[in-house]
């Protein structure tokens, strides 16, 4: 089982908010492929989207979203000198915020 998936299950069981950041698009060279994910809580992270400054920026963005109550966001990162990465490609990340709100189901009008 992927580390992020096990962490997601654990967060859901403990009603802990988290952000799931996923690589949704690539251009050129990058350290990880489309579909790679990292799960970020207020004090931990699970799995990897490639390490380095890209991952550092992604973790910082995710934690800011947790603090501010952000919504799903897509951000494009060039993997060049500005991130201190030599891959030279571009990575597009989707950040999905999962809060601790419990969902309930109400059924009515069944007859």
Regions found by a protein language model. Give the residues of each.
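Segments forming oxygen-rich coordination pockets for charged ligands
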Residues: 1-111
